[in-house]
Amino acid sequence: MDLVSTSTSPFSCRICNQKAHGNHFGVLTCRACASFFRRAAFSKWSQLKCQKGGCSRNFCKRCRLKKCREMGMDTTKFQYNRDSFRATGQFQLPPPRSLASFVGRPELFLFCDTEAPNAKMLIDVRYLLEEAGRIINQGYETPASGKNQLENLTEGFKYIKVDMNNISSSKYASKDAIISMWEYYFFTVTRWLMYFEGFQKLNSHTQITLIQSVWNVWSRLHKYVATVDYHKANPDTLPTNVVIHNTLVDIENVEFDSTWLSDYPVEHVRRYLSVQHCREFDILGTLRKLNPSELEITYLFAQICFEHAGKRNQGDIMKVTEQFLDSLANDLHDYYVNEMNNSRYFLRLTQLLKINQAIQFSDISPQKQIRNNIIKKEAEKLEKLQKSQFSIKRLSISN
């Protein structure tokens, strides 16, 4: 609507003859008369008689309202819901951002039958703990000779480094192959930790608890390191090729037997797992760019394992792992300053640790999500996907 300035308007209000403000509800009026009509248009004054018996200049409310209507003020020109706030009772939740968030299920399984029977299949893994205990009792395979704990642990790098001459390829991931992979990583982590003096001094219960806590996260970092090494040695290989254990797998084309893991269709399970793989390219790119030494890689493995175990178990184990991390950090500082002659290593170390951060955070933006919620949501997705469970819950692959 066209407004007329009160300081320069030569026009008068059609209701009270005061200086006009503008066109309100179809009539040139002042602010006061416009506000009055807005308040009184649907009030009792429309039905009452004149309070003075006849108004000529100083209108009563009934006559003022009558004059407004006679001059042409129109209630159909009222505008509603223009306030910058809303009453509490009118608040409405925004619509969900996606169907998956509304339903509470991963996108890949929206149209699967949620009522279908999903009996759990028990996987007996007690023999893993028995074999790990035997390895611990055997002690070193070869005595460590490093000058500090990080160097001793680096002597176990032979368990991290993959023999490129003995890598086989596979186009089918069977149940036996997957369980064999779990065994390999569980026992390899145990042998590797035996090179760490602090681990040897722990009681057997704490040792087993640490192994149970870290074997899975250790295997994830191992997959990245082995894959980067393979791509360096074979630059023409497909970017979707990854090395798991000592096997080359095209993650996009591998046939996957998931019938023992889940009742969901195989293609849905594989698609879910391939989505997880798509998130890993940044980690692989960072490893290629930084090209860390054996000692730096060893520190990455130790850092992610002990930090993960501490946060997961809390209490006394967290105190122990914090001591381990402090000791290893001092050894790494000595390596950078005295051997690499690099006292300004902070930026490089920060970039290296971002690899571990990405693994733990599943590369979902930490600026937008709380870490605990991320882990909980991803674990819930995997829990819905699985129909198998370990005889020892702490060994679950979702941990």
Swiss-Prot record:
GO terms for molecular function: DNA-binding transcription factor activity; sequence-specific DNA binding; zinc ion binding. Residues 149-392 form the NR LBD domain. One of its GO terms (cellular component) is nucleus. Residues 10-80 bind DNA. Gene3D superfamilies: Erythroid Transcription Factor GATA-1, subunit A, Retinoid X Receptor. Transmembrane segments: none annotated. Keywords: DNA-binding, Metal-binding, Nucleus, Receptor, Transcription, Transcription regulation, Zinc, Zinc-finger. It is found in: Nucleus. Pfam families: Hormone_recep, zf-C4. It comes from the Eukaryota. InterPro entries: C.elegans_Orphan_NR, NHR-like_dom_sf, Nucl_hrmn_rcpt_lig-bd, Znf_hrmn_rcpt, Znf_NHR/GATA. A zinc finger (NR C4-type) spans 13-33, 50-63. Belongs to the nuclear hormone receptor family. Orphan nuclear receptor. This is Nuclear hormone receptor family member nhr-125.
